[in-house]
Amino acid sequence: MISPLLQHISSPQKLRSLSLDQLPLLCDEIRNRIIATLSLTGGHLASNLGIVELTVALHYVFASPEDQFIFDVGHQAYVHKLLTGRNTEAFSNIRHDNGLSGFTSPQESNHDIFFSGHAGNALSLALGLAKGASHGSSHILPILGDAAFSCGLTLEALNNVPSDLSKFIIVLNDNQMSISENVGNIPQGISQWIQPPKFDKIFQKIHSWMRKIPGFSRQKSELLHKVDIALKSLSHPLFEQFGIHYVGPFDGHNIKKLIPALEAVKGLPYPVLFHVCTAKGNGLAEAEKDPALYHGVKAYFKNHSPKKKPLSSEVKTPSSFPQHVGHILCQLGEKHPRLQVVTPAMSLGSCLEDFRKQFPDRFTDVGIAEGHAVTFSAGIARSGTPVVCSIYSTFLNRAMDNVFHDVCMQELPVIFAIDRAGLAFHDGRSHHGIYDLGFLCSMPNMVVCQPRNASVLERLLFSSLLWKSPCAIRYPNLSTRKEVSNPSFSPIFPGEAEVLCQGDDLLLIALGHMCDTALAVKEQLLDHGISTTVVDPIFIKPLDTELLQTLLSHHSKVVVLEEHSIHGGLSAEFLLFLNNHNLKTDVLSLGIPDIFIPHGNPETILNMIGLTSDQITLKILAHFNFSAPIPI
């Protein structure tokens, strides 16, 4: 049910028609809308509950889209969407088919300036906007939250802010969290800069006392508030060294104080850092108690009763690739007493909490700093210590040069556990892990592989410590299984593929979890009288050239199947192999087309790009002219 005030807010202009006294009720309605929606769809919950009052205040004081808001990270923009004409059925389906993106998207609204999904870029983008065009009477407001302020790119941009840049307000949404608790010196430093709570309490008492004095007018009260803001701006000189005027901190949940404070900094002829303190998960008791757990949720309500998803330590039998990785790393930690694990702010998502708790001195979360995570891991490896760098595929893109310069060029045996390889579905274009093979396979010394199930994953992780070379083990966030329960197994070495089944008419090479799809296609082709050899290459680089040459001696028709961009993946490596060995064969390459893939449900996305088993079967029949395509 749409709320009484919120249902009338079709634009920020409509918001500004409300009185100040109505805004707290509106904030409650917004929270209820977000909680009710995400209980059915899942999404980024805690961050958006924490930014409600701040977003309402920003839209109340400034005039978007003339005043430009840039959210960092973009997942904290749900409130912004509700206030900018998107409180519709599309919001009710957020991150799903026919729904809004879970991040800012210019395709949805001119109130969204950029697509956003990765952290730390807002300040650079905002400075570019200011440099590239005269914004006249308009303001530019990068809104930094969830540890975006401590990203290296943010600090680089901070060093580049002109001291005479007017109408430029950096809003720091300080919730002392990223996805989980902040790490490192910068967030701790910010906490130390915050004024003691006693200061605000004393000032409130003075204000309350003075209001009782006869003749104390509203104008004098406003003047006193301006004195409060001035004192807040004088108390922390650090940003002044950057030429940035600091104001704060302010209570991010007191909208009646936020609005006059924002009015006071509006139109200033120099850059301002507006520091707001919020509580991630505010307004939902469970999320306030455990904001990390409620950062990103699945549909977690049943009969309006919150259902907690289990922490990794509560998972007795791993069922997904990330859970198996977390379990195997704990086994490796026991076997190798010097093994180190490094991650850039993805301990919970990548199921590393058990390792962190079991081996706290051998676990490092570097925060949202992917380049540093890679180079830090390189330093560990150079010391002779085994190290696993656990990182999402989409975030590894940000550290490509670190992989090249600090790992591969140095020939250091860093083991990259690359999570979320493949389609991210609900998170959309910024989070699909479908581009990493293009640069990983181009780097000398790098071994690249992908397991089809938990058994192969286990062999790869245990064996990778024997390879003594940089290696990337990529895997999706999908359910998987172990084929055997026997803990003893033989090691596997780079360039070893596996034949899953033999046939005479077609060779089907499928990468990782796509082997399951390939085996389903094999059965469908059998209905057409076509027998298929299915091969799991395991290694994209190096390929098992000996096995492939043997198979190609009696297969003239080949299909390469992968959930990766058709450019730069397994198919590209296979075609290079054919060219290098002067082999001629008919190859059908099936992968992800050269477009940005939107968000949506798995079935919808796979159908859109033609990677369902039915579609693959029809493409094979048509391409090789086995028979006229028959709908299945």
Swiss-Prot record:
**Keywords linked to the UniProt accession:** Isoprene biosynthesis, Magnesium, Metal-binding, Thiamine biosynthesis, Thiamine pyrophosphate, Transferase
Q: Per UniProt, where does thiamine diphosphate bind?
A: H75, G117, H118, A119, A147, A148, N175, E370
Annotated EC: 2.2.1.7
Listed binding positions for Mg(2+) are D146, N175
Q: Which GO terms describe its molecular function?
A: 1-deoxy-D-xylulose-5-phosphate synthase activity; magnesium ion binding; thiamine pyrophosphate binding
Required cofactor(s): Mg(2+); thiamine diphosphate
- Give the reaction(s) catalysed: D-glyceraldehyde 3-phosphate + pyruvate + H(+) = 1-deoxy-D-xylulose 5-phosphate + CO2
Q: Does the keyword Magnesium apply?
A: yes
What the entry lists under InterPro entries is as follows: Dxylulose-5-P_synthase (IPR005477), THDP-binding (IPR029061), Transketo_C/PFOR_II (IPR009014), Transketolase-like_Pyr-bd (IPR005475), Transketolase_C (IPR033248)
Question: What does the entry comment about cofactor binding?
Answer: Binds 1 Mg(2+) ion per subunit. Binds 1 thiamine pyrophosphate per subunit.
Source superkingdom: Bacteria
Which pathway does UniProt place it in?
A: Metabolic intermediate biosynthesis; 1-deoxy-D-xylulose 5-phosphate biosynthesis; 1-deoxy-D-xylulose 5-phosphate from D-glyceraldehyde 3-phosphate and pyruvate: step 1/1
Q: Which is a GO BP term held by this UniProt record?
A: terpenoid biosynthetic process
- Pfam families given in the database record: DXP_synthase_N (PF13292), Transket_pyr (PF02779), Transketolase_C (PF02780)
What does UniProt give as GO cellular component?
A: cytosol
Q: What does this protein do?
A: Catalyzes the acyloin condensation reaction between C atoms 2 and 3 of pyruvate and glyceraldehyde 3-phosphate to yield 1-deoxy-D-xylulose-5-phosphate (DXP).
Q: Which PANTHER family match?
A: 1-D-DEOXYXYLULOSE 5-PHOSPHATE SYNTHASE-RELATED, 1-DEOXY-D-XYLULOSE-5-PHOSPHATE SYNTHASE, CHLOROPLASTIC
Q: Which HAMAP family match?
A: DXP_synth (MF_00315)
Q: What family is reported?
A: Belongs to the transketolase family. DXPS subfamily.
Q: Give the multimer and partner information.
A: Homodimer.
Protein name, please? 1-deoxy-D-xylulose-5-phosphate synthase
List the source organism: Chlamydia muridarum (strain MoPn / Nigg)
